[in-house]
Amino acid sequence: MWFLWILATFIFAKTKSRFYVSVFILTNMMASIHQITAYFTLNAAYVMFFAAAFVYAGSLGMHKRLRNIVIHLTAAAAYGFIFLFALYDPVWFIIKPEWAAVILLTVITLSVEGRFPERLCLFVLGMCQGELLYAAVIRNIAGAAAVGDYKWLSGCSAGVILLVGLTTYEQLAARISQKSKKQGKGATKMS
């Protein structure tokens, strides 16, 4: 989370939204030590991520398209599947299930969404819903489980950093390609 806050505060371009993102991340870090007990024990940072993702999805109009709802539920099911598979058959995992889930959700997000806001929203919604799904299934087996613990928060932060990095890489590659095409056109016109 600290790395996200440093990125948002010092690296990103100065905009009004950058300020809100920085405040959200800082508030989220402070809230991560608090637990909310309802049907599940929820981490306050998890609740903030979940609420912010749903509000942001609503502002983007993602709830109006069936495609986005199906994709976000698919991402949640993939997250839940990874953790349940790791629970019942852990020998198949070479890496930690948290990292496998982050990588899988990042690949799903990058392959179905083109713009960064939709990618971010889909990723966070998939992580939140998947964690809730996993906790609901585990509750019947092992009793009460904490939803949105520090492992989840770390994985979600790492996934967001990965999304920012890969989206920046895509934009950089597109600019380089566009610049090389412009330089190539000038060379053919001169000959």
Model segments located where?
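Acidic, metal/ion-handling microdomains and their immediate structural contexts
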Residues: T15-V21
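C-terminal transmembrane helix-loop-helix hairpin of multi-pass membrane proteins
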Residues: W2, V112-S191
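Structural signature of hydrophobic alpha-helical transmembrane segments
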Residues: M1-W2, I36-F49, P90-A100
